[in-house]
Amino acid sequence: GYLGGYAAPALAYGAAPAVAYAAPAAYAPAALTSQSSNILRSYGNLGQVSTYTKTVDTPYSSVTKSDVRVSNDAIAHVAAPALAYAAPAAYAAPAYYH
């Protein structure tokens, strides 16, 4: 038989669920990345050009970083000689007498 009035249901239909469901991490959009680096040296390793590039692409944005460096040791050594010679005073600047 019937035992008294209605009992309160164990689950109220209007209540918010205790667990909120979110998309699993596997469904997140993928990001594509790439990077490269190169070094080009001259004959005798007197100068070099080095490049580095990194790219990150997502469905929402794209970022690229680049770095290019040029060095030339030959110019550095020629620009600052260890011993400098000066012209004799007679040839340095002509003097005019009136």
Swiss-Prot record:
Which InterPro entries does UniProt cross-reference here?
Cuticle_C1
Extent of the sequence repeats: 7-10, 15-18, 22-25, 79-82, 86-89, 92-95
Q: Does the keyword Repeat apply?
A: yes
> Which Pfam family, any one of them, does this sequence belong to?
Cuticle_3
Q: Name one GO molecular function term.
A: structural constituent of cuticle
UniProt note: domains: The tetrapeptide (A-A-P-[AV]) repeats found throughout the protein are also present in many proteins constituting the protective envelope of other species.
- What does the function comment of this entry state? Component of the cuticle of migratory locust which contains more than 100 different structural proteins.
| Protein name in UniProt | Cuticle protein 67, isoform A
Q: Which organism is it from?
A: Locusta migratoria (Migratory locust)
Lineage, broadest ranks: Eukaryota, Metazoa, Ecdysozoa, Arthropoda, Hexapoda
